[in-house]
Amino acid sequence: VKAFSCDTSKPKAHQYSPPTADSTEFTAYNLYAKKYGSQYPEEVILFLAHKDSQSWVDSPGAYDNCTGTVATMEIAHLLANHNCKRSVWFLFCNEEHTPWTSIAAAQNARIKGTNLIAIFNLDSLGGKSKQSLDSGLKTNVTLYTEPEGEPFADLMTEVNEIYNIGLLQTKFMRQRPGDDDGSFINAGFPMAVMNVGSYPYADPNYHLETDRPEPVDIENVRLATQARLASGL
């Protein structure tokens, strides 16, 4: 992969631009953890998050995407000794470099005939506007692109209500595939969805050097992780 170049003529949060032809190439690895199911091991539930922060700006990436990475790790930790009927895989990829390594992961899954029955992308959990943060709102949006993804978005609403988790949970249908879930949709897995703190994304520190741990609403991240785990099982 290559780091994105920085185009300072663009708005600060969107200064990424294609790398130059002579820019340095790096080897980026997709990291997997796999827990095989006890009854239906051929059916795979996938949780994924991009593990890298922005390559064109010196951002710590606390919301984007340390929150999604930590949430995915926590789900793996909680399921380590749980008897899962279906297999649960965890994928950590790169999305702030080019090309996205989730593209390779999705294409490999299609080539190998992996029976992915649910795909959950965790990205920038809890990231929201300052107004929402100051108001104490615990927000989560589930994005889906194809009709096959809507039931998984609705499931987030159901578990939020059943278990009284306390999220302000909404859903939104995108017009085209995007982010790492979009890599899987483009590879023929239309059920893929993404969880994010707000949409349109409203964190004022988005893609900035100020995306630091201190402003992160960790309680919001915890609640979104709980709901994602509950809906995944």
Mark where each language-model region is.
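Surface-exposed patches in mature extracellular/periplasmic domains of secreted proteins
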Residues: 1-6, 84-88, 166-175
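A non-catalytic alpha/beta surface segment that caps or lines the substrate-entry region
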Residues: 1-35
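Solvent-exposed loop/turn segments at secondary-structure junctions
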Residues: 5-8, 39-40, 51-55, 94-99, ...
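Active-site-adjacent substrate-binding region
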Residues: 10, 130-233
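Acidic/histidine-rich catalytic neighborhood of metal-dependent amide-processing enzymes
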Residues: 27, 54-151, 155
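Soluble periplasmic/extracytoplasmic beta-strand elements of cell-envelope proteins
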Residues: 32, 46-48, 89-91
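Loop/turn elements at helix/coil->beta-strand transitions in domains of secreted/extracellular proteins
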Residues: 41-45, 83-89, 113-118, 161-167, ...
